[in-house]
Amino acid sequence: MSETLAIYGGTPAVDVTKVVNWPPVDKTDEKMVLDALYAQVQTYGKHNMAFGEEFAKWNGNQYALFTNSGTAALHMCLVGCGIGAGDHVLVTAYSWSSSATCILHHDAIPIFVDIDPETFLMDPDKIEEAITPRTKAIIVVQLHGLCNDMDKINAIARKHGLKVIEDACQAHGALYKGRKAGTLGDCAAFSFNQNKCLSCGEGGMFVTNDEEIYKGGAKLWSFGEIARPDERRDYHAYALGWMYRNNELTAAFGRAQLSKYDFYFNTLRDNGEYLLKNLAGTPDLLLPYEPEYATHNWYNFNLRIDFDKMHITDPEEQIAFRDAVAAALRDEGIRASVWQRFILPEMTVFAAKNAYGMGYPWSIPGADEGVDYSLEKFPNALAYSRKHISIVQTLRAPNGLDIAEQVRQGISKVFNNLDKIDPERIRKILEDRMK
């Protein structure tokens, strides 16, 4: 293998012609989707019902409702837990925007909590100091497919009378002390979009073991109506509702993919463990951390650059160097990306405190008391946003250890040549490609 970086003209480490795209589709998917295609019912049909039932059984939930997105499922969780206008909800400072915009959907206020620098998850030791008199719930984001310390978080929630909502949108099959994500709080949301470990293109799942939470959240699913999917509709809006239903084709694809998910999960586990073992000791590379209590699903395998050892302290220099390293990894044939460049309090929708105009919902009398989005409160989240690189999809099934080894070679090649990474040169190379 050439040690000249591929971005400078060397041979890529990964033979991308051997990498199977995600999600893999076979006859099982074709048969299920064609069955839905030729059915006379495209909504409220058998596949929607069956997907919810099969997912609930697989994951260990009593109730599950298939939605059109993970964001929709998160909104349903909040409503099911009785969150309303002016309430406060704790959430990590680093995640996808939906983890916090879902709070705004029902006129509540996000209260951000900094992350643990090793797990990248909300720091449980910072939760209590963030609780305000208006706090009603904690959204625990099982980010990148890793579960947080749920015993500690649930104990805090019980002490303060708070609901616990799992954002498990990336955590299909991830475990906490042997229990699956989505069963560790009062309710949970999953996502099935293109990038997820379990994908049907787009979609989500609202799950809970609490009948009252299910009934409350389900009102949003279909225009505020209360009929279950298997019951006759009366077309009466009993509450403010959205249109969060999904269709039969997507549900059928989801069912087929779920039937293969244990294989997908085990493949990801094997590939992730292989990289952890065989990249140990790579210079200036910080590998992801898996606590003893957790079983990661490796939705994202996150690399971090050890800027402390490299003596790069300026944030802008860190970002430019990280972006150049990510570009070099991509040219080696690795699907590497910067998953989220901004921490949530940095995003305009939160920083401006003006979601709906006239400062709403922060302008609700008393709602903004104790709400501080100053970026200096979130040093760990800021630091992480500047130095991480995510590997997505390349490690997914059916790609096995042969591909994982090529990925390892590509990562080793780039990190053993960090002295040759010239951010300005790489920026110009990328610009020239766009011409």
Where are these regions (language model features)?
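PLP-dependent aminotransferase-like
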Residues: V79, I83-A168, L175
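Basic phosphate/pyrophosphate-binding loop/patch that engages nucleotide-derived ligands
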Residues: I131, A155-K163, M205-S222, A320, ...
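N-terminal "arm"/small-domain region of PLP-dependent enzymes with the aminotransferase-like
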Residues: M1-V41, I391
